[in-house]
């Protein structure tokens, strides 16, 4: 009977856990819809701004703005974007390990490679392994463009002060509920891509002037790229957590089925034993 009670207690415990994982899945699904809408809205704006900036930058000298000047690379900063919370599968661990791979592969290229971590999980993983220059935590629950602009301003200020010569960001880009792609991008210095063949010969008129627009667009471009990275990470986090909680719920259901089968067999064996004892007692009385 003691064994039956322990099995029944475990079944109740797993059922309670399944209720929690199902609830977390539903919450993540609701948050994912909103986060996905934000990502879908931000991508065209970020893409078009980058396109305009690239066209403009191609017509200027590489030193037209301090943010475009490519210096002798001595120091680099890697911005690592993870989440503040867990229970989202390998979302944080995979990205933190990818950041560490980048550090190990590129550390020979720099005299110093430091980190800025956004999200508690990445900070906890990397703080004892590498130099964390700055940490931003607890920003995702109230994430806004203003927050991203403040972080971008820190990056630009440090770059202009020559605290670092290159800035990279690594984050999970949202592809689908099941898929998040670890993405590494260079934020600073801003570089213009090679002109597309279908744009050759096209002339654009810029007002008030190319230099003035460049000075205005470059900081805005950094802000938008940081904001997009954060939005992508938030959507990816909710997708990963939704998938993880769905898997946990299915595993719990499977475990409940197995435990129920074990319980029924144990109960049947206990009843059979009791019947045999009753029959044996009855036979001994008759004898």
From Swiss-Prot:
Q: List this protein's GO terms for biological process.
A: proton motive force-driven plasma membrane ATP synthesis
Can you name a GO cellular component term?
proton-transporting ATP synthase complex
The answer to whether keyword Transport applies is: yes
KW Ion transport (keyword) present:
yes
Q: Which UniProt keywords apply?
A: ATP synthesis, Cell inner membrane, Cell membrane, CF(1), Hydrogen ion transport, Ion transport, Membrane, Transport
Query: Which Gene3D superfamilies is this protein grouped with?
Result: 3.40.1380.10, ATP synthase, gamma subunit, helix hairpin domain
GO: which molecular function terms?
ATP binding; proton-transporting ATP synthase activity, rotational mechanism
**InterPro entries xrefs:** ATP_synth_F1_ATPase_gsu, ATP_synth_F1_gsu
**Cross-referenced PANTHER family:** ATP SYNTHASE GAMMA CHAIN, ATP SYNTHASE SUBUNIT GAMMA, MITOCHONDRIAL
Q: How does it assemble?
A: F-type ATPases have 2 components, CF(1) - the catalytic core - and CF(0) - the membrane proton channel. CF(1) has five subunits: alpha(3), beta(3), gamma(1), delta(1), epsilon(1). CF(0) has three main subunits: a, b and c.
Q: What does this protein do?
A: Produces ATP from ADP in the presence of a proton gradient across the membrane. The gamma chain is believed to be important in regulating ATPase activity and the flow of protons through the CF(0) complex.
The similarity annotation says: Belongs to the ATPase gamma chain family.
Write down what this protein is called.
ATP synthase gamma chain
- Organism this protein belongs to: Citrifermentans bemidjiense (strain ATCC BAA-1014 / DSM 16622 / JCM 12645 / Bem)
